[in-house]
Amino acid sequence: MKDKIINVIGLGYIGLPTAAILSQNGYRVYGTDINKDVVSIINEGKIHITEPGLQDIVHEVVKSGKLSAHNEPKLANIYMICVPTPLKEINNKFEPQLSFIESAIKSIKNLLKTGDMIILESTSPVGTTRFICDTLKKEGVDTANLNFA
């Protein structure tokens, strides 16, 4: 399993620690974030968030080549979506906004191949995996041979 390449999309409070720990455990991990400053900081072996012990781990895994950060997703076997799902008030109800998830999914559509796995780590409402499948289908991706978690 450790021969699988993982692409973590979203390098915030969930994505960066997840990417770092996976890298520390022997996986090759590409981290993707739209913020160029975040990518630069991580590639220097530093962190942009506060998390006890994370700085040392990120420094170690970047130096070893197990973790690198990019502004665009890279080819992988497993894509882990770790982007925000902010709430927006609509008709006096707070509704989760799936636009960041949609953008993340669209950013990997041309990289997906048979057997790949998409893991949604973002806090999201019931039906979000169906939303992901429907989005991919609308983008012309055959989802029959993809795995979702």
Feature map (PLM): residue ranges:
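Gly/Ala-rich phosphate-binding loop of Rossmann-like dinucleotide-binding domains
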Residues: 19, 23-24
